[in-house]
């Protein structure tokens, strides 16, 4: 029988709506002896059963719910069922877009809190970000090895958020033999080089797939400035769509080298592509001072806010960079701008860009609102899963 955790009066409402987190300040008491990662039953103050999850005593989120089904045990078969369901939910997308790289498990939104798994061709990359996920590591790897026998399994749990769970950063091979890096994945007929050992996150930003395709609609015969380009995939889509010129900007020389490789593996000539190792904030100001302009600008910056205390600063940062980008666009040009900060509400992000347009003395029209690709689902009871917000604006 699992240890029981009783909530304070009135703190059961979020779990009754199937939100999977129990915060430390909502717990009344713990009945039984617990080790970190142990499975616990959560009950309301009046004793009625709410859910079954993993105990994480050092985290502000002290329980992450595995299941809201009282009859469901947390064992190897549980993880196998969840992974099979997630794969089935992505099969149509894989066929439609010809994907060999996709998100297999999107943590809470796939019913596996703290677990992210991305598939890059014949490599599965895991991030285990919670105590419960860490404790079940061997079982998760065993299930993946059964379901994907031709895949190597590599861990990229080298993230600061593990510290909040009392866990050390870790990465390395968990199963099989890792192929030579980079691996090549495909999406929408485009090949992309991914280094799962050195790349950002698990190796690549799969969540922007649909937005890369969206951007390609606006670039034929146009000049494109691709800011925070990482491995240049917005620029890659633009090159294939017939952009007249492309400038890929990133502070990482390694990322720009991969951007060049991506052009080569797709058989594309990059004579009209400029690779600029530079600080985007400084470069945009320089271009404004020089009077340089573009037809299309992509702004895909890193996360500006990791916690609520940083949100005001993030708002100022987003407003500043969007204002300068708007000043660099030719009349009739297009801005594609993104925020990957989960704490940034979509409506607030749109207001920030609108305010930036006022300061830039430019008239804009919002023509698309963008989000993460559909292999990054948002659980109906887990709005925190909606983290990527994007806007397409026509600029006059």
Curated annotation (Swiss-Prot):
Domain PUA: residue ranges: 2-79
Keyword S-adenosyl-L-methionine: yes
Enzyme Commission code(s) on record: 2.1.1.191
Location in the cell: Cytoplasm
Matches recorded under Gene3D superfamilies: PUA domain, RNA methyltransferase domain (HRMD) like, Vaccinia Virus protein VP39
Main localization of the protein described in the UniProt heading: cytoplasm
Cited PANTHER family: RIBOSOMAL RNA LARGE SUBUNIT METHYLTRANSFERASE, S-ADENOSYLMETHIONINE-DEPENDENT METHYLTRANSFERASE DOMAIN-CONTAINING PROTEIN
This protein's name: Ribosomal RNA large subunit methyltransferase I
């Amino acid at each position: 029988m699992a240890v029981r955790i009783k909530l304070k009066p009135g703190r059961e409402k979020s779990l009754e709506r199937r939100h999977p987190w129990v915060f430390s300040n909502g717990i009344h008491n713990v009945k039984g002896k617990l080790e970190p990662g142990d499975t616990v039953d959560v009950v309301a103050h009046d004793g009625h059963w709410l859910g079954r999850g993993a105990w994480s005593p050092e985290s502000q989120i002290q329980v992450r719910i595995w299941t809201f089904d009282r009859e469901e045990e947390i064992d190897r078969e549980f993880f196998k069922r969840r992974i099979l369901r997630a794969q089935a939910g992505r099969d149509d997308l894989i066929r439609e877009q010809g994907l060999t790289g996709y998100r297999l498990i999107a943590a809470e939104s796939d019913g596996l809190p703290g677990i992210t798994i991305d598939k890059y061709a014949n490599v599965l990359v895991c991030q285990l970000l919670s105590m419960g996920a860490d404790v079940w590591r061997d079982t998760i790897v065993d299930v993946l090895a059964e379901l994907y026998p031709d895949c190597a399994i590599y861990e990229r749990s080298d993230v600061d958020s593990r510290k909040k769970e009392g866990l050390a950063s870790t990465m390395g091979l968990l199963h099989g033999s890792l192929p030579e890096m980079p691996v090549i994945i495909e999406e929408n007929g485009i090949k992309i080089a991914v280094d799962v050992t050195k790349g950002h996150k698990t190796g690549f930003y799969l969540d922007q797939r649909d937005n890369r395709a969206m951007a390609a609609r606006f670039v034929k015969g146009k000049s494109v400035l691709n800011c925070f380009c990482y491995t240049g995939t917005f620029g890659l889509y633009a090159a294939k769509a017939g952009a007249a010129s492309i400038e890929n900007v990133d502070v990482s020389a390694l990322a720009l080298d991969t951007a060049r490789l991506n052009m080569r593996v797709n058989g594309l000539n990059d004579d009209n592509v400029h690779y600029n190792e530079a600080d985007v904030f400084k470069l945009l100001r320089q271009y404004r001072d020089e009077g340089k302009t573009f037809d299309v600008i992509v702004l895909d910056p890193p996360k500006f806010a990791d916690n609520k205390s940083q949100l005001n600063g993030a708002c100022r940062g987003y407003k500043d960079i969007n204002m300068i980008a708007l000043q660099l666009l030719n009349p009739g040009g297009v801005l594609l701008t993104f925020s990957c900060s989960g704490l940034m509400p979509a409506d607030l992000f749109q207001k920030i860009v609108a305010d930036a347009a006022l300061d830039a003395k430019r008239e804009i029209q919002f023509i698309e609102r963008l989000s993460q690709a559909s292999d990054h689902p948002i659980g109906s009871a887990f709005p925190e899963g909606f983290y990527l917000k994007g806007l397409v604006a026509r600029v006059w």
